[in-house]
Amino acid sequence: LDSNTIEIKNFGNFPSEFLKKQKKNVKFIFFEKEAKLIPHNLSDIQKNLLRGPQIISSKDIAWIIHNLDLKSGDTIIEAGGGSGALTTALAQAAYPEGKVITFEKSKKHHDIVKINLRLSPFSDQVDLRNEELNEDSPRIECNSIVLDLPEPHKLVSWAKESLVSGGKMVCYIPTINQVENLLSSLNGWGLSLIHISEPTRQDR
């Protein structure tokens, strides 16, 4: 509703000021019919994000959250905030007692994430930092780590020192060369499970 006009399918474009005045879950007359505003959900947030870097798909986000077994009370480290699509989902998964610490070294991308977090009712769970996470960064005790970076293998040592017992790490990488470098860096760390997945998406 930040736009001056809003488009509703099968109705057309009209000034958004009218809807801004309505209260959630309270009926009002709209095009001669009863209507009401309902609270937005994560899917609505994802569809309205300001675009910057390529956004992680909703299917991949769901896979990441499921495999990290995220829950309230967890501390989650995210490196590579991008446009904040994953950040908003992690924040919701960690609510109300958990927190997400997101590192984004690009000022441009950091500012995009900051703007997009305003759409989320769970933004208070996020500590957004305009910093690079690297092997020399101070260790942060955490339950989960998500790396969306070109060279995640350089952070394996940092991750091992930061993760609590039973903690998990997900690396979101697009090329087989990156996978090979990561697997090579994991040798000898005594990890209980290493899993490689290539999610596919089919919208019908």
Residue map of PLM features:
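Conserved SAM-binding motif I beta-strand of class I
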Residues: 99-104
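N-terminal auxiliary segments of SAM/dcSAM-dependent transferases
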Residues: 1-36
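Conserved class I S-adenosyl-L-methionine
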Residues: 73-82
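A short glycine-rich, Lys/Arg-flanked "PGG" loop and its adjoining helix->strand segment in the class I
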Residues: 156-165
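Single conserved hydrophobic/aromatic residue that forms the stacking wall/gate
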Residues: 194-204
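Conserved SAM-binding loop of SAM-dependent methyltransferases across substrates and taxa
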Residues: 83-95
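Conserved beta-strand signature within the Rossmann-like core of class I S-adenosyl-L-methionine
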Residues: 166-173
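S-adenosyl-L-methionine
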Residues: 105-140, 144
